[in-house]
A protein has these predicted regions:
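C-terminal motif of bacterial Sec signal peptides marking the signal peptidase cleavage site
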Residues: 16-18
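Conserved blade-ending motifs and adjacent loop-strand segments that build the rim/top face
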Residues: 43, 88-90, 238-248, 301-321
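Structural signature of eukaryotic scaffold interfaces centered on beta-propeller domains
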Residues: 47-52, 96-100, 142-147, 191-206, ...
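Blade-loop segments of beta-propeller domains
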Residues: 77-111, 132-134, 312-316
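Beta-propeller blade signature
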Residues: 164-166, 289-303, 342
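Short, conserved, GDST-rich strand-edge loop motifs in beta-rich repeat architectures
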Residues: 276-292, 337-341
Length: 345
């Protein structure tokens, strides 16, 4: 009788272990296919980012003579190039993050820890310096503007997940914590977590909600003056990593060759959050055998999974059009080129 009770207790415990936090991966009940079409005369050497404003696609390049190329959808050709690469006046060093509005631009020189505001003329693609050069802490990796005077920064910080910065690059406050899906992850130093959970952002101005995607986790954070509060955290793919700390810095990487590469980009609209997902594994990537096509995972701003879009190509970076009906991307066809991905409806 005693042995039967032990077996019964063990059987009841199995669901508890199988449903541990590390296994609560997001799932979708709906999926749809999407067809890609390469645009004419739209080749890119090493793509970094792509954004759409009106008729123009702005494609970032890592090693071109210019770091930003302007492609006209109506003319189906590159019509201009911006951000000449170099170390002279009005030149830029790769890699850069760029943010454009109708009349302004914000350029972040990521590996040189500086940023600059500009006025922007969309008619002739000219930019003009505005204000002083912003010097950023060397611990910052990515920045994202959420208003005219506030920026969210991620990087490798000892005591927080995010920094909130003002227009001069000053730290206004510190916010946020990291996921703890890996067993014992809560004991890992913040600096190692920051190296592994590198973030990309999108922002909903109406909701004042920040979307943050790492390779394995999607998070929604509510912004109130000078602070971020976690609204929802979703596991995109299970992960496990190891880290090493020494006087020269911190090193962290996945130690599971069969783990999926996971999220590779994020785009947002007023209605949805889109995550560019790579289902290939670390092993497939190392052996240059990535046979699975990219997917786009769609969520609403409450974190509800809406559908999975299965594309027919490998996508490096992407953005969504204003109507939530098509995606513009840099894809492999087989060379890097700008294309459009149209889901079936």
């Amino acid at each position: 009788m005693k042995s039967k009770n032990i077996i019964l207790l063990f059987t009841l415990a199995l669901p508890l272990f199988s449903c541990s936090e590390s296994q609560k991966r997001v799932s979708f009940s709906e999926s749809t296919s999407a067809k890609s079409t390469a645009l004419k005369e739209a080749f890119i050497s090493i793509p970094m980012d792509i954004k759409k404003k009106g008729d123009i696609l702005y494609a970032g390049d890592f090693k071109g003579d210019s770091l930003l190329y302007c492609y006209s959808l109506s003319e189906q050709r590159f019509v201009n190039q911006m951000l000449p690469q170099g170390q002279g006046p009005d030149e830029f060093l790769s890699p850069v993050e760029f943010f454009l509005s109708d009349s302004s631009a914000f350029i972040h020189n990521r590996w040189h820890f500086t940023a600059q505001n500009y006025t922007f003329n969309a008619k002739d693609f000219s930019i003009r310096r505005q204000g002083e050069l912003i010097h950023l802490p060397m611990s910052i990796d990515r920045v994202y503007p959420i208003s005219e005077s506030r920026f969210i920064a991620s990087g490798v910080f000892e005591d927080c997940r995010f920094l909130i910065l003002d227009n001069d690059g000053n730290v206004i406050s510190k916010s946020g914590d990291f996921p703890n899906y890996q067993s014992g992850e809560e004991t890992i130093p913040n600096t190692a977590k920051g190296m592994f959970h590198q973030s990309q952002f999108g922002y909903n101005t109406d909701r004042k909600r920040l979307a943050c995607a790492t390779s394995n986790v999607l998070e929604l954070w509510d912004y109130k003056p000078e602070t971020l509060t976690l609204h929802k955290r979703l596991l995109l793919a299970p992960y496990h990593y190891q880290f090493n700390s020494n006087p020269d810095g911190v090193y962290a990487e996945s130690d599971n060759p069969d783990a999926e590469l996971g999220a590779r980009g994020i785009a947002v609209s007023n209605n949805y959050v889109y995550v560019l997902y790579n289902p290939n594994t670390n092993r497939m990537h190392e052996e240059q055998k990535e046979t699975l096509n990219s997917e786009i995972w769609v969520f609403d701003w409450e974190g509800k999974p809406i559908r999975k879009i299965l594309t027919d190509t490998h996508i490096e970076c992407f953005c969504v059009d204003e109507t939530d009906t098509s995606f513009y991307c840099v894809m492999t066809a087989p060379d890097y080129c700008i294309g459009i991905v149209s889901p079936s409806h």
